[in-house]
Amino acid sequence: MIYKWLILLTFVAMKIENDLLLRAARGEDIERYPVWLMRQAGRILPEYRAVRGALSGFKELVETPERAAEVTIQPIDILGVDAAIIFSDILVVPEAMGLEYQLIEKKGPWFEKTIRSTDELIYANTNFDIEDRLGYVTEAIRIANKELNGRVPLIGFAGAPWTIFCYMTEGQGSKTFSESRKILYTNPTLAHELLDRITEVTIKYLKAQINAGAHMVQVFDSWAGILGERQYEEFGLKYMERIVNAINEAPITVFAKGAYASAHKIAALNCNTIGVDWNTDMRTFRDIVGENKTLQGNLDPCVLYSSHNEVEKMTNNMLNSFKSKRHIVNLGHGVYPDVDPEKVKTFINTVKNFKIK
């Protein structure tokens, strides 16, 4: 434990060589836009596939701190992004609470048990120490920070309560999450109890990541868009707001994919940065948000299937549409696994070469 605290104190005091991301998030002056990609540490890189191929699969990689740290750093060296994001998965939280999951090849996550009744809340435990059950994530953060040696910031993350609720009640991925949404109508008391528990654990988890050395954190609400405006306000934003209000130790980003009807409410959250998906017009969203928030995004991930010239053109078109220097460049969603890494480099280099007006 003393060793871990010594490492933490070292990195708290360490100056970040490339702190563009953090300055952009705080609204400070930047000489160019910072750029990174969601899912940058992943299957687009042969080097990642080599590390994963030596293990039993994705979960073992997530749960092995040394290897998770290794693939976290790969995009910094190979792609030249301005930030690292810890290699992990949003589903480590429900597993820590009591619902184990498996990742089925070509199908995605699958839970043997689900929570659809009050009795099943035994699988939503909150009375545990984060380091005991999720220490492999915080250890990966410590190792990655040591290896990064202050080159770029390290981002931690978690799933938003509504998205985690979807998996804990549906038991697998879904286009509609009808079982999850049904509970909102048939047993809203259960829904709020489960969301409350997820929120409690998520706050502790994000704080643990920051304590381990994460310089910034992001909350992913991947399934925000399947709810209507009123439902998302009650079952999504209410709990997202609790999280952003509780996290004040580091800049925080919220990414509520598809929640267009709730744009004004999202803009009012006490966060530093708001992620924007590719279906949202960035100029319109900036008008809603104003100048007091940083925006992140929002190139269509499929643009990276285009020619290098087209990637450069579309990236410049996006950059020219920004109305503010308060911006972190990213895709509007995670990079797809079959994208050519060279196209990703074209995207990144185009951003780096762009002159802010």
Predicted features along the sequence, with ranges:
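A gly/proline- and charged-residue-enriched helix-loop-helix capping module
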Residues: 106-146
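A short acidic, glycine/proline-enriched capping/turn motif at secondary-structure boundaries
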Residues: 90-93, 108-109, 118-119, 161-163
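N-terminal basic, low-complexity leaders that serve as flexible interaction/assembly modules and, when applicable
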Residues: 11-105, 242, 341-357
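Short, flexible active-site-proximal loops enriched in glycine and acidic residues
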Residues: 83, 112, 153
